[in-house]
Amino acid sequence: MLNKRTTEVYALGQHISMSAHKARRVIDQIRGRSYEETLMILELMPYRACYPIFKLVYSAAANASFNMGSNEVNLVISKAEVNEGTIVKRLKPRARGRSFAIQKPTCHITIVMKDISLDEYIDTDSITWSQKPKSKKKHTTMSYYDMYSNGGTWDKK
């Protein structure tokens, strides 16, 4: 029987204070590239959107090494998307006691990385047969501990 293995990890950045259009301009350059190539591109691009995306790519790679134990050399950005977030509304004071509405856009960025060295499916039949015990004991004795004497802390005065 084949079971599906998780080969993808993601990092999600929410409420990043920049326009989704400006973040998409950077995301389109790194989609489908390897981890090391992505870091080099993001360090050299002169846009303000590069720094939060750099942090998300680095976080997704840390998630992959912690959760799956994968190496950074094998990581590829499989999916990168930018969605519009909430609009933060502020008031700017103007002349003669008036105010002017300022809308500050936010965005949500999702980076999904895939480990290309791992297989997507695992053959569980070969694993379960090798891990089963060869003989079972029919009768097992259970030993109960005396739960009322726990080292004598309550017995002493």
From Swiss-Prot:
Q: Is rRNA-binding among this UniProt entry's keywords?
A: yes
Supply the Pfam families for this chain.
Answer: Ribosomal_L22
What SUPFAM superfamilies does the record tag this protein with? Ribosomal protein L22
Organism domain of life = Eukaryota
What gene is this protein a product of? rpl22
The cross-references to PANTHER family, in alphabetical order and at most eight, read: CHLOROPLAST 50S RIBOSOMAL PROTEIN L22-RELATED (PTHR13501), LARGE RIBOSOMAL SUBUNIT PROTEIN UL22M (PTHR13501:SF10)
Q: Fill in the subunit field for this protein.
A: Part of the 50S ribosomal subunit.
- Which species is listed as the source? Lactuca sativa (Garden lettuce)
Protein task: This protein binds specifically to 23S rRNA. The globular domain of the protein is located near the polypeptide exit tunnel on the outside of the subunit, while an extended beta-hairpin is found that lines the wall of the exit tunnel in the center of the 70S ribosome.
Q: Which GO terms describe its molecular function?
A: rRNA binding; structural constituent of ribosome
Listed GO cellular component terms?
A: chloroplast; large ribosomal subunit
Q: What is this protein called?
A: Large ribosomal subunit protein uL22c
Q: List residues traversing the bilayer.
A: none
Keyword annotations from UniProtKB, A to Z: Chloroplast, Plastid, Ribonucleoprotein, Ribosomal protein, RNA-binding, rRNA-binding
Extract the signal peptide range.
none
Could you tell me which InterPro entries the record lists for this protein?
Answer: Ribosomal_uL22, Ribosomal_uL22_bac/chlpt-type, Ribosomal_uL22_bac/org-type, Ribosomal_uL22_CS, Ribosomal_uL22_sf
Q: Which family does it belong to?
A: Belongs to the universal ribosomal protein uL22 family.
Q: Name one GO biological process term.
A: translation
Q: Where in the cell is it found?
A: Plastid, Chloroplast
